[in-house]
Design a protein with these regions (language model features):
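Acetyl-CoA-dependent GNAT
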Residues: 1-39, 44, 49, 100
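Conserved acetyl-CoA pyrophosphate-binding loop and the N-cap/start of the following alpha-helix
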Residues: 52, 56-64
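Conserved GNAT acetyl-CoA-binding A-motif
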Residues: 69-81
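Short beta-strand-to-coil "C-cap" segments at the C-terminal boundary of structured domains/repeats
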Residues: 107-111
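Conserved active-site alpha-helix within GNAT-family acetyltransferase domains
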Residues: 71, 83-105
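Residue-level recognition of the GNAT/N-acetyltransferase active site
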Residues: 49, 53, 82
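Helix N-cap/coil-helix junction residues
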Residues: 57-58, 74, 94
Length: 111
């Protein structure tokens, strides 16, 4: 069972991280705690406005989520991504775990 966006937004486990520049939101990350994965974190959305892509906002949000995972003593962060984003998430410390119906299932594990 995967958390849907609607379930996550209505959940007390929802995590929303925002990146702003000059008061405007330029990127956001939405994640949730998945009770079926021992409370690991699941990234549901990571979006950066096109004009701000390639400037490190996504990486900053992922780093903040990793810090939060460590603080909350979570073992892992999971994300499903498309093939064209594999190298991006690999650079962020995620590894390819399996193919899924939503792309490639990737995981970052706390050390």
């Amino acid at each position: 069972h995967k958390a849907t966006l609607e379930e996550a937004l209505g959940s007390k486990e929802a995590i929303t991280l925002l990146a702003e520049q000059a008061g405007d939101m330029v990127a956001y990350l939405l994640a949730t705690e998945d009770q079926h994965l021992k409370g690991d974190l699941i990234v549901l959305r990571l979006a950066v406005r096109p004009a701000f892509q390639g400037q490190g906002y996504g990486s900053i949000l992922i780093a903040a989520l990793k810090d939060l995972a460590v603080q909350k003593e979570k073992k892992a962060i999971w994300i499903d991504c498309s093939e064209d984003l594999l190298s991006y998430f690999a650079q962020q410390g995620f590894r390819d775990e399996a193919e899924s119906d939503r792309g490639v299932h990737m995981v970052w594990e706390r050390k």
